[in-house]
Amino acid sequence: MTNQVPWNKIILEEFINLALLTKDEEMILRTRIYGWTVREQADRLNMSVSSVNRIIKRIKKKYDEVEKYSAVLPPRKSSEKEMYLDKN
């Protein structure tokens, strides 16, 4: 998800406020944006890798649900082609 949305402070705070993220969800999102791997998150936040992946899936679902109600949140890139075009 960190590659699917161009995260900045405004977008991050808007999403956190609209989606009513839990503390765990917010921490997972912030650490993903900072570049932590799923394994790092699991180790440092005392969770299993599957729990981190489950939370990431929940965050993506919440983003898709609240994005349509915000003028600030951009649509999430959904295809490999879109992400490839940004990189090259």
How does the language model describe each region?
Residues 3-18:
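Short, Lys/Arg-enriched N-terminal segment that forms or immediately precedes the first helix
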Residues 18-25:
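Short helix-coil-helix linker/hinge
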Residues 31-35:
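Short helix-to-turn junction characteristic of helix-turn-helix DNA-binding domains
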Residues 40-45:
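Short alpha-helical "recognition helix" segments of helix-turn-helix
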Residues 60-68:
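C-terminal flanking helix
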Residues 68-82:
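Short, basic, alpha-helical segments at the C-terminal edge of helix-turn-helix-like DNA-binding modules
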